[in-house]
Amino acid sequence: MIARAISKAGITASPYHAGLKKADRATVQEGWSSGKIQVAVATVAFGMGIDRHCVRYVVHWSLPKTIEGFYQEAGRAGRDGLPSHSLVFYSPEDVGKYKYLIRMQGNKSGKGAEAERMAEKNIERKLEQLELMQDYCTQLKCRRNTLIKHFGGKSVNCQKTCDYCRNPKKVERSLHASSAIKDVRRQQNMFGKNGSRKSKGKQAWNGQWDKPHGDDE
């Protein structure tokens, strides 16, 4: 779907995922590596296998689950030293969905007190990592220095290489607009567009899976 939409805009794009035949995946990878395909719409696994230095953009269609993962994936852009961009399409609903999946997967661990203790500890760790990534996307401060400090480095002059340092007012407006949209959707989930109250089950479902997207670099 995403690759098709990009292609309609006049940019050559192809999907790359496990559902494709091996020969088709090889064709896409070869085409993208040679430059015939401008955009590969792919899974994280494909992205981490990239060894092409002239990547100009890495776009995350949804929120990465950890800062470490985001840093590795975004780092695939600009390995030739030239200016490049990392873009994240962030939605609060992504966070709700991931929290749900983390807890569901954690609850599938083995039985017994020790297994349950380890599962709970693992769930807490993953939720903390997710919260750090969410904070990165919603903060009102330099994103470059946030990453540097996360990995134990010292602050640097960003030189307007992140969206916040380039235009802090724009980032603030975007976050406020996203919050307002979320409030409107919450009201729609509770009462419906015609003003009638929905069932609690419907509210919970819509709250987890509706997905309006904002963006952060």
Regions found by a protein language model. Give the residues of each.
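C-terminal accessory regions
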Residues: 126-158, 162-164
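A general structural signal marking secondary-structure boundaries and capping sites
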Residues: 36, 137-140, 169
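Soluble or luminal CAZymes and related metallo-dependent hydrolases
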Residues: 24, 122-125, 129
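Helicase motor core with emphasis on the C-terminal RecA-like subdomain
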Residues: 1-111, 117, 155
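A short, ordered amphipathic alpha-helix with a cationic face
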Residues: 87-89, 120-123, 133-136
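Accessory DNA-binding and partner-docking regions appended to nucleic-acid-acting proteins
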Residues: 96, 102, 108-118, 126-127, ...
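Intrinsically disordered, low-complexity sequence elements enriched in Ser/Thr/Gly/Pro
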Residues: 23, 74, 142, 183-184, ...
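Generic alpha-helical segment signature
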Residues: 63, 91, 123-126, 140
